[in-house]
């Protein structure tokens, strides 16, 4: 599955194993950009890194699709779509090369993820989790129609416990003519 941008050389497609190393680099750089980790706190090395094995496992997973944005042969973004029970999918691992931010690439990746959730998994709803303390990030997703469910998920880590806000969005189903 490939999505072409209206202008430029940007292409969004399902990642394969040839993209693994570039994706690992992108995700690590996106997570650690500007001295901040994905948690909004100073990064610890392990938190700002993802292993090549983890990337390869995501690419090979049966019930998920790792999408990659490529511009002129360079990986500039990614998003993970995972099939969940009950006609739902989850959006995760949204990352954009720090030099390509504020150009609408995140919006394109979200749109591609939504289309993939519908076309590949038949989902009628998509959800994501945002760190509860990251209000700006929750506001970003709200601009795309995601709304808080009121549900929070807690993830215990070695040094802290992280609390996530669950947000969902209904997906438009194509109307048969």
Regions found by a protein language model. Name each.
Residues 69, 91, 102-110:
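Glycine-rich acyl-CoA binding loop
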Residues 83-94, 101, 120-124:
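A conserved beta-turn-beta hairpin within the catalytic core of GNAT-like acetyltransferases
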Residues 1-21, 171-177:
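Conserved N-terminal entry element of GNAT/NAT acetyltransferase domains
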Residues 108-125:
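Conserved acyl-CoA
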Residues 123-139, 143-177:
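C-terminal "cap" of GNAT-fold acetyltransferases
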Residues 28-55:
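Conserved GNAT-fold acetyl-CoA-binding loop/helix
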Residues 68, 74-82, 90-95:
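Conserved beta-strand in the GNAT
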Residues 52-68:
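A short helix-loop-beta-strand connector motif used in the catalytic cores of GNAT acetyltransferases and
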């Amino acid at each position: 599955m490939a999505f072409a941008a209206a202008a430029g050389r940007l292409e969004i497609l399902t990642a394969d194993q040839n993209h693994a190393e570039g994706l690992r680099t992108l995700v690590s750089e996106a997570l650690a950009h500007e001295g901040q980790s994905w948690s909004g706190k100073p990064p610890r090395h392990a938190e700002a890194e993802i292993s090549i094995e983890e990337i390869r496992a995501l690419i090979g997973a049966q019930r998920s699709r790792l999408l990659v944005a490529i511009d002129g042969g360079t990986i500039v973004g990614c998003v993970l779509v995972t099939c969940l029970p009950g006609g739902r999918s989850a959006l995760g691992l949204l990352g954009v090369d720090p030099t390509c931010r504020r150009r609408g690439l995140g919006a394109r990746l979200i749109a591609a993820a939504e289309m993939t959730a519908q076309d590949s998994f038949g989902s009628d709803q998509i959800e994501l989790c945002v760190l509860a303390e990251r209000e700006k990030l929750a506001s970003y997703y709200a601009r795309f129609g995601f709304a808080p469910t009121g549900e929070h998920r807690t993830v215990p880590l070695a040094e802290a416990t992280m609390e996530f806000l669950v947000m969902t969005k209904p997906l438009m189903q194509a109307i048969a003519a």
